[in-house]
Amino acid sequence: MRVVLFCHSLLSDWNHGNAHFLRGVVTDFQARGHAVAVFEPRDAWSVENLLADAGPEMLDETQRVYPSLDVSRYDADTLDLDEALDGADLVLVHEWNSHRLVQQIGRHHARGGRYTLLFHDTHHRSVTDEASMSGYDLSAYDGVLAFGEVIRESYERRGWARRAWTWHEAADVHRFAPGAASSDAGEAHARGDLVWIGNWGDDERSEELRDFLIGPVQRLRLAARVHGVRYPQEAKRELAAAGIDYAGWLPNYRAPEVFARHRLTVHIPRRPYVAALPGIPTIRVFEALACGIPLVSCWWNDCESLFRPGDYLVARTPREMEEKMATLLRDPEYAATVARRGRATILARHTCAHRVDELLAITAGLRGTSVEKVLTV
């Protein structure tokens, strides 16, 4: 098969979590012998911020880490869709693309494109910003891949797409796995108690970070570290006052080695996900569990039963968060049991290979054929 992906960026994951899962999907397709071409805008804001924050050498590093990535950076006014889509069998268009490009690809498909065309939505805007999402012209698309049942239902209820399927994110377990601590970046940090990898959140979880991370860490006097971007000066001062080391942006593919240097991590979802998107944990949960680190999560509604009780610990209040942190640090054997259980669920149900299998089944269903025949196109 020839797969074509249009996305915001795979070269940069600066404040851009969609890159994590999509890199894993591309890698898995390639491991199965399929050709994958990726198109991203030359002026992608994630790339521009990465260059400003870490320099051009980070783009080179991404290519070294993912040597098989075939990424073309295009200018919107000169993109030749006939050339880009020539010979395509499956085309995925992520929702972080312009309304104009989404429509142009749909029109290309309507003019006789023989590929399967799917729109991929991994954001809360279909529930929280209906006006923006309703502006996408998906009339010529074969369907929508939604990263949660609530998103799928939203598309069907509003008539935005012909069909929609729930297609959750997952972990790239070739990259995200338990590993020894490394000093690749010239660092030699002692093993810490807790690490949080995540961005401040544009006021979507500022209070939650104060209540469920900064407060408990300060009261327990933990050796803690935070990686992420868009932390205002006030937030950095609060972290410092709590004794938390703020370490800035971390390339996503380095997360496993950072997890390996710490005894536990936490998940603090953004407010819109908890309030309006039940069943969607976001990519960080999958990746942390894949790395075999004990996880304490703020409560979120796992209404789709993605995980088993005990795969991670749940804290409904700041006091519960503090207690769960203390329990894991006090009882290493129990912490190891939690970590093993969480990783086992990822390996059994939530890898990028599982999602590629699901995507191939969806494609076969649309074509009225078997997966085997899809693969021989």
Predicted features by range, described:
Residues S9, N15, R23-T27, A37-Y155, ...:
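Extended catalytic core of nucleotide-activated donor transferases of GT-like folds
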